[in-house]
Amino acid sequence: MRPAGRSNNQVRPVTLTRNYTKHAEGSVLVEFGDTKVLCTASIEEGVPRFLKGQGQGWITAEYGMLPRSTHTRNAREAAKGKQGGRTMEIQRLIARALRAAVDLKALGEFTITLDCDVLQADGGTRTASITGACVALADALNKLVENGKLKTNPMKGMVAAVSVGIVNGEAVCDLEYVEDSAAETDMNVVMTEDGRIIEVQGTAEGEPFTHEELLTLLALARGGIESIVATQKAALAN
């Protein structure tokens, strides 16, 4: 029996609260069960030096965890004087995922920074970050159109992510912390709304997994992401 009695293919309750803060062009509080992440999208005119004069935009991301988002306090990375490898890996993943959602040429020379701050962690913080940041990004792009800075919206479609894994020999979707810490296989999957794969990060923590198990996990992820995308679209429709 999984925590909260979920079936193996069932994601946790997903909530997306838009306009959570007042200053950012897009802001969303995303909740995957007890995992809560604040995602903001900020627009700046101009692009990084390596893109100047090319007539296209850029999307980047930063990720961080509040000191007491976990069971025991972790010092802020600013206090340590440098970002950890995990943080850099996750924020690059978020940026790659969200660049796949946008026509960067149609964006023009704007940079959008997605800030994902974990308020409470109970597994799946990176997948929640991608899911919430996509909605914040959609709101920010809508503002560019509403303000007359873009003629057409460069958003190509929604992007969402979910964790899957093998726990106690069974393939399950959207792992909570207690499952994640005991998983034999742990995988994060990012997809477009039509089921195309953007990224798969998979690791055998114990016993190596088979090709058949990989296909099972990808199918579980697709089903979970379809449900999450429906929640994203419902949030944007309100």
From Swiss-Prot:
Say yes or no: keyword tRNA-binding present: yes
Q: A GO molecular function for this record?
A: tRNA binding
EC category name: transferase
Question: In the record, which residues are listed under signal peptide?
Answer: none
InterPro entries according to UniProt = ExoRNase_PH_dom1, ExoRNase_PH_dom2, ExoRNase_PH_dom2_sf, PNPase/RNase_PH_dom_sf, Ribosomal_Su5_D2-typ_SF, RNase_PH, RNase_PH_bac-type, RNase_PH_CS
Keywords from the named record? Nucleotidyltransferase, RNA-binding, rRNA processing, Transferase, tRNA processing, tRNA-binding
- Which processes are annotated in GO (biological process)? rRNA catabolic process; rRNA processing; tRNA processing
- Residues given in the record as phosphate binding sites: 86, 124-126
| Coiled-coil zones | none
Enzyme Commission number: 2.7.7.56
Q: Does the keyword NADP apply?
A: no
**Which reaction(s) does the protein catalyse, per the Swiss-Prot or TrEMBL entry?**
tRNA(n+1) + phosphate = tRNA(n) + a ribonucleoside 5'-diphosphate
**Cross-referenced PANTHER family, in alphabetical order?**
EXOSOME COMPLEX COMPONENT, EXOSOME COMPLEX COMPONENT RRP41
HAMAP family attached to this UniProt entry: RNase_PH (MF_00564)
Q: Which family does it belong to?
A: Belongs to the RNase PH family.
Task: Relate the protein's function as given in its record.
Answer: Phosphorolytic 3'-5' exoribonuclease that plays an important role in tRNA 3'-end maturation. Removes nucleotide residues following the 3'-CCA terminus of tRNAs; can also add nucleotides to the ends of RNA molecules by using nucleoside diphosphates as substrates, but this may not be physiologically important. Probably plays a role in initiation of 16S rRNA degradation (leading to ribosome degradation) during starvation.
Question: Which proteins does it associate with, and in what oligomeric form?
Answer: Homohexameric ring arranged as a trimer of dimers.
What name does the UniProt record give this protein?
A: Ribonuclease PH
Source species? Escherichia coli O127:H6 (strain E2348/69 / EPEC)
Q: What is the lineage of its organism?
A: Bacteria, Pseudomonadati, Pseudomonadota, Gammaproteobacteria, Enterobacterales
